[in-house]
């Protein structure tokens, strides 16, 4: 079947923040420059709405609808908006699965993480990290959710994962290996480029949703101890707790909140170090952006950041065998400026090679349209 368009399905979309929102927006905009039809089906806190921007048709379905109405409306919208189009599901997995069973249309999935674990963390049900959570005995409601999520992956033609860590989790959920494709998240190297000019007046920057597993409390404490200023970009349920912590320990922290994508390169250009302290990460867009802009980066081993950072070559991975913490990694970077300068250059090269949007988006498009 020759398909002349693409329909991207995502649970979140800008101005909401987060990796899936960023992907849905950049990928659909990119696809609209190649294909005659590009559309997005997503959710919103407001009323149902329909708009067109950058040549992309965007249908937003209200989260205020009751669950049955929302699922049916979503399934019908995905089906209706994907005539002659491939369907790429990056969120709303259960809605897409329902559409498949009711209306018989095939789709490709791109998963950002384990949505069952994320919901359990956000609701306070668990404090476990993503790996330990896999073997835990879940309450009935979550068992049902896990079964439904797995069914949505089994029903897909292909399952795209952005990191080796996530690939191993998906295999453990019982998805056939030959159905899984590893394609890293990627960024536009035109938008995020190295700018050596300008004053570096931000010591440490981090860009993420403010949720517990991002480990921002440790970053605040480390910056407080080392007397470094910290800029936190992003918003989320942990904001108040983090603001209180910063006050309590006298840290110099600037909470910027959610900002427009095109303001990020300027912030990166002013920053010395980027820290990503999450216990789970697929391929973090912010980490890729920072490295493309020549900001020395620190992240965690045993996460998708292992696919991005070559430890002690083009960055530092914490919580690994050599025992780096956020604080000791920052201290090491401050005291080894030659290493940092060399690492920044190598990081930019590696980003161009492995995380190039043009190359990776083409692969995703080919899989979705085949």
Model-derived regions: residue spans:
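Membrane-proximal helix-turn-helix segments that form the acceptor-binding/catalytic region
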Residues: 75-79, 131-159
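Conserved acidic donor-binding segment of nucleotide-sugar-dependent glycosyltransferases
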Residues: 311-312, 316-323, 332-337
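Short alpha-helical donor nucleotide-sugar binding micro-motif in glycosyltransferases
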Residues: 153, 258-259, 266-271
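Conserved donor-binding/catalytic core segment of Leloir-type glycosyltransferases
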Residues: 7-9, 196-214, 220-227, 231
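Carbohydrate-associated surface elements
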Residues: 165, 186
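Aromatic "clamp/platform" in nucleotide-sugar-dependent glycosyltransferases that forms part
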Residues: 279
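Nucleotide-activated donor-binding/catalytic signature segment of Leloir-type glycosyltransferases, i.e.
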Residues: 243-259
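Short hydrophobic beta-strand element within catalytic cores of glycosyltransferases
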Residues: 296-299
